[in-house]
Amino acid sequence: ELCRQIVHFNPSKLIMVDINENALYMLKQEFLVMKRKQQMNDSIQLESLIISIREREEIYKLMKSYKPDVVYHAAAHKHVPLMEDRPTEAIRNNIFGTKNVIDACCDCGISRFIMISTDKAVNPTNVMGATKRMTEMYMQSRNTKCKIHMAAVRFGNVLGSNGSVIPIFKEQIKNGGPVTVTHRDIKRYFMTIPEAAQLVLQAGFYANEREI
């Protein structure tokens, strides 16, 4: 969704990086169809790159080769129960992977870095939240030593996103139930996927140093 909204601002080039090859392929195909239907500026250059944020050398090559104006960092393991079972995976990916991206942005002179975080980073009570809080702290400490604009955007529940409660509820209902909830009196607050993407883009424009 973030890429879909970015193309409406007519960037000269959009570099889409993911470890999920199928998602990356399908997104590029969607954009090519939009170009053919003249729903998107045909002059926008599209690059699809399969790279893991854990591969420090590859991330540095990416930044040095393309020198992007803005980096939006959304890669993370976010499923709370799974990360409780595999905390080392959460640490390797969420902390050290993000560190690779931040370091590369600083060392390669990228102008802006925007990181997707979570409200679970506030007084974290689980592994996922703790890893995201550590990445926020690293971003803030690193930004004192490099002259680029950095910010983290904290999200709560994004309606319909992968791993969010609505797709889980739909699947449970489809399979005949039961529908599981944490507690019968719990309240959840949601934003839509387009609203979340707009917030990230606004943060990219207004972000100052070390803001969350």
Task: Place the predicted regions along the sequence by residue.
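Aromatic pocket-lining residues of Rossmann-like dinucleotide-binding sites
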Residues: L2-I6
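Proline-aspartate-enriched helix->loop->beta-strand connector
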Residues: P11-S12, M63-Y72, V80, I110
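Helix N-cap at the beta1-alpha1 junction of Rossmann-like dinucleotide-binding domains, i.e.
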Residues: I19-A23, I53
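NAD(P)-dependent short-chain dehydrogenase/reductase
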Residues: L32, D103-C106, V127-E211
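Conserved Rossmann-fold cofactor-binding substructure of NAD(P)-dependent oxidoreductases
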Residues: E47-V70
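Conserved beta-strand scaffold in the Rossmann-like NAD(H)/NADP(H)-binding core
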Residues: S48, M115, A152-R154
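Conserved residues in the N-terminal Rossmann fold of short-chain dehydrogenase/reductase
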Residues: L49-I50, R92, H183
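Conserved Rossmann-fold NAD(P)-dependent oxidoreductase catalytic core, especially the SDR/UDP-sugar
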Residues: H73, H77-E136, S141-N143, M150
